[in-house]
Amino acid sequence: MSGEQEPDDSYARVRAVVMTRDDSSGGWLQLGGGGLSSVTVSKTLQPGDSGGTEFLVHGERLRDKTVVLECVLRRDLVYNKVTPTFHHWRIGDKKFGLTFQSPADARAFDRGIRRAIEDLSQGLPASCHGESETSEDGPQVNKEDHYSTHNNDHFFRSDSIPTEELYRTSVIRPSPFENLNPRRAYIHNQVPLKPIRHVSFQDEDEIVRINPRDMIIRRYADYRHPDIFRNDVDREEPEDVTFFTKTDSKKPSYLYSPANGRDSLKEQKPVEVCKIQPTSSLKKSKGKKEDGEHSSCVYCQERFNHEENGRGKCQDAPDPIQRCIYQVSCMLCAESMLYHCMSDSEGDYSDPCSCDASDENLCLRWLALITLSFIAPCMCCYLPLRACHHCGEMCGCCGGKHKAAG
């Protein structure tokens, strides 16, 4: 079931305890006596000559190298975050669970699952590395360059591109009926009108790098409304076209000359290539680098600028004010009541203050909360205090701050 994995095809790699569902007791038990396992979310080649890809969750116990988890991801996956360190998911009638060592590992695994499902839904090409292939529009480009070009508009934010990373160039073969002009960029006449953005990414940044602000999670109760299938925010469009001459390349670039036939090669030292790039994003990245030092946050695993780090910048960092509001307003009583009275067979229940009209227990839940507020009047203070806290986050007075690792 698992193919030969490439390091670049890994979405997440964490250590966790693999759990199994016990239908008799309605709970979760450690699989095979427990023990930490190395769990990886990756893209692998399907066995046989089909040449397709599949997205796999693979778990191997560390102490004896036994494979304890082998799960092929599908589009009908339902992912639940029960606690900050315990997540489980269901594919058809099969259920899988993981207990993580820390909330940071759980968040990294969650982001890896979302990225894998996103790529599965979009339908990535079967191979992203190797020799050149012919695209549907006619031009022949290198597979590695085609992968970074095709998927940048769909899955990656261009503001995370390092400016010091050199751009990879791709030379597109012109039609033998077109005139060869070294002062122009060659674009096939069947290429769509929408320009293709051509950028490159660092290998380690492709594994798990999602801005946590794309999916706002206030606390672990939000797992009851799965949004792993939600698309990212609207992608920014390329703003301009820049022509540059690459003169310091160590390898010569070759163009097919129509004058000497399709099989002849013509070497040119200075080659002008049409590069489409978002200048605003590059300037923004360059400005960030000049502003101050960047570090990785221990809570959200994202890189941040020390000079721009303030309250409310990290959604995963501990927030003492929010914790105080939660305790003062006795929200623990509300969640306990919902867990014992309105949870399903999995032990899941809706967020106490959710107004989702699709919830069949919406009216009953709010009626129970109003009744409970007569016993604990301090619950009425939660919504006003939470609104004030949100205003404080917008002003930079409240919220969690990034903390540098190490």
Swiss-Prot record:
Top-level taxon in the UniProt lineage: Eukaryota
Boundaries of every SPR domain copy: 296-404
GO biological process, alphabetically ordered: regulation of signal transduction
Biased composition (Basic and acidic residues): 142-154
Membrane topology classification: Peripheral membrane protein
InterPro entries: KBD (IPR023337), PH-like_dom_sf (IPR011993), SPRE_EVH1 (IPR041937), Sprouty (IPR007875), WH1/EVH1_dom (IPR000697)
Region (Disordered): 124-154
Segments forming domain WH1: 3-120
Domain KBD intervals: 195-247
PTM summary: Palmitoylated by ZDHHC17/HIP14.
UniProt-listed Pfam families: Sprouty, WH1
Localisation: Cell membrane
Alphabetical list of Gene3D superfamilies matching this protein: Pleckstrin-homology domain (PH domain)/Phosphotyrosine-binding domain (PTB) (2.30.29.30)
SUPFAM superfamilies referenced in this protein's UniProt entry, alphabetically: PH domain-like (SSF50729)
A single cellular component GO annotation: plasma membrane
Xref: PANTHER family: SPROUTY-RELATED, EVH1 DOMAIN-CONTAINING PROTEIN 1, SPROUTY-RELATED, EVH1 DOMAIN-CONTAINING PROTEIN FAMILY MEMBER
Identification of the protein by name: Sprouty-related, EVH1 domain-containing protein 1
Species this chain originates from: Xenopus tropicalis (Western clawed frog)
Organism classification: Eukaryota, Metazoa, Chordata, Craniata, Vertebrata
